[in-house]
């Protein structure tokens, strides 16, 4: 893990759960924290058993559906967080609008959450493209669409 990124987290962190070795076990721990009323933080990415895609800056954004699945199963609210480095070297942190869905189907739920996230993320990436580290989660519109069982 990057010490620059984890330095501030470590001041407030109860526990770090890594999915590097066992994603299923990590998700169980996160679900338990939610069931206990805790807050969790998940970095958006495309590592997971299922992906959902949404239109994004003329292409598509492909993300793992683990966070939406946890939110749906537990009733938790997803609050996206956007962090930008300011000119003076400090960081500006913005908590976005809650990502919500009334979809009863888990795949439709995840797709709607990813679409809302993509819509909220787009202005930050458009205005601060040099600071975004998620380009690897994007694809051109003409690339192959996901099938229902895609994995990272």
Each predicted region: which residue ranges?
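Catalytic core of membrane glycerolipid acyltransferases/transacylases, capturing the structured
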Residues: 1-21, 49
